[in-house]
Amino acid sequence: MEGISITKLLVIAVLIVLLFGTNKLRTLGSDLGAALKGFKKAMNDETPAAKKSDGAEAAPRVENKE
């Protein structure tokens, strides 16, 4: 099996540009970039439930005795 060649990828890219137009693709890329930026920001922000309170200590570690 050959896979997808460069010429096939170029033909697919040209068809996509012809179907959607450059303006629609530009707005789609912009919207996708904004969505990814928002997702990354949400993943990096700590939620209040994930923060440890000042008075709380970690539970002692329990090991199995056999």
From Swiss-Prot:
GO terms for biological process: protein transport by the Tat complex. It holds the Pfam family TatA_B_E. The keyword Cell inner membrane applies. InterPro entries: TatA/B/E, TatA/E, TatE. GO terms for molecular function: protein transmembrane transporter activity. Belongs to the TatA/E family. TatE subfamily. NCBIfam families: PRK01614.1, PRK03625.1, tatAE. Part of the twin-arginine translocation (Tat) system that transports large folded proteins containing a characteristic twin-arginine motif in their signal peptide across membranes. TatE shares overlapping functions with TatA. HAMAP family: TatA_E, TatE. This is Probable Sec-independent protein translocase protein TatE. The lineage of its organism: Bacteria, Pseudomonadati, Pseudomonadota, Gammaproteobacteria, Enterobacterales.
